[in-house]
Amino acid sequence: MLRGSCEAYRQQSEMEYYRRVLEALEHYFRENGWQKKFLNGGCFWLASILHQGIDGSVFMINRVEEHCALYFENGLYDIRGRISAKNFHPASEREISFMKKNYIPRFDVKKLEEYLVRKESLPLGESS
């Protein structure tokens, strides 16, 4: 019973971290269509931020769509929420290195990370 309760708490806190990050991003950008920033270049940055706060999460890549997402809590998540895992596979170290170099966010990463730590109190380490 205790093990099941701990697992449920851990999953709840993983999902809570995911929600906190998305809410913080919504507060930061405050513009229509802001989510597109994380579908066109910012997907690896988001997956990295989420990965820092979600133990056991796995970077996933879709080479067809050139998109990155994070697998945790038995599902695949990006800025849109839970998404289909079709055409995704766990990213190798080489693919992670590729994404770091080529999936370039179209926003000021340093400024956003400072906001997330200072204003939203998210426990971020180094993100890239």
For each feature predicted by the language model, list its residue ranges:
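A structural boundary/capping signal
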Residues: 1-128
